[in-house]
Amino acid sequence: GAGRADDLAERDAHCAPRLDPASLALLSDAARRTWHFFEVCVPASGVGLPPDNLQLDPAAGLAMRTSPTNIGFYLIACAAARQLGFIRDDEMLKRMRGCMDTLERLEKWRGQLYTGYDLNTLAPLRPRYVSAVDSGNLVGALLLCAQYVSAADAELSERLMQLAAGMELRALYDAERDLFHIGMDVEGGRMSASHYDLYASEARLLSYVAIMLGQAPVKHWQRLSRPALRTDGAWTLASWSGTMFEYLMPDIWMPAPENTLATEMQRGALDAQQRWARRLGRPWGVSESGYYAFDIHLNYQYRAFGLREAALCSDVSAAVVAPYASVLALRLAPDAAARNMARMQELGWLG
């Protein structure tokens, strides 16, 4: 309840790292710039939902499509902007209500959003597909924001909770294997043959919220594979692509306690990234991201970049460093992450 949330907030405030003024200024500026994307681009969509991206060079403008994960992060960004003092309660609530007004009328499958929607028509993108990890991300965001706004707007909080409760995550659960399918091909009427079966995965949040909501059994958590490996002397758990995203993204919702498998796994993965970067003399933070390749419309392409020594997949490359990976590492290693971001700024990477 609220008392437990207050206890956690007080503990986190007490344990918050003390960064130097320059690092704090850098992080504050990065946060404000990040919020500015949502501040400007969501109203431009006209439907209260975040466009997928804004591409300035080559000029392509707003990508007028969105996804459940994009929407979830926008809702969290509204709460974070309020927490950081960028906006007041009234703007946060107005934005969340506008988002919910659209979300509640989107076409869904078993209460879950499809992987993509056209923001001009609000129609699902074809072929219609439901992603388990997308659904987990959105449920996590809805639950977080429902608690955050409960005192300011009980009705909005209830709407957020009801949307989360209506998402039938169990429909994607394989009871025979006790694992989640990657997703559902709605056009073809079939579940994916593949499953999310690794603990070191962005799908860890999906597993957690599904168990919490009673939509997956507790034994599912033990079914997630935890293959250990060594990378330059540090140990971690293997992920599929060796990306920072897989190890750290769930921390946004469920920060791992100290002296647990999750934290040791994350520290090992971060150590491997830092060793790799030192050898090459560059910033660390290899993760999935956009990169310098284009389709026929000159849109940047997107793929997973990761460390081969931490990956089970053989087709991975560490060719691209993603600045957002440093932000994901702030809780785990605040000083190192801030220094890494400062170095990126010195190299002219600030957009």
Model-based region annotation:
Residues 1-8, 13-351:
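Ser/Thr/Asn(+Pro)-rich, low-complexity disordered segments
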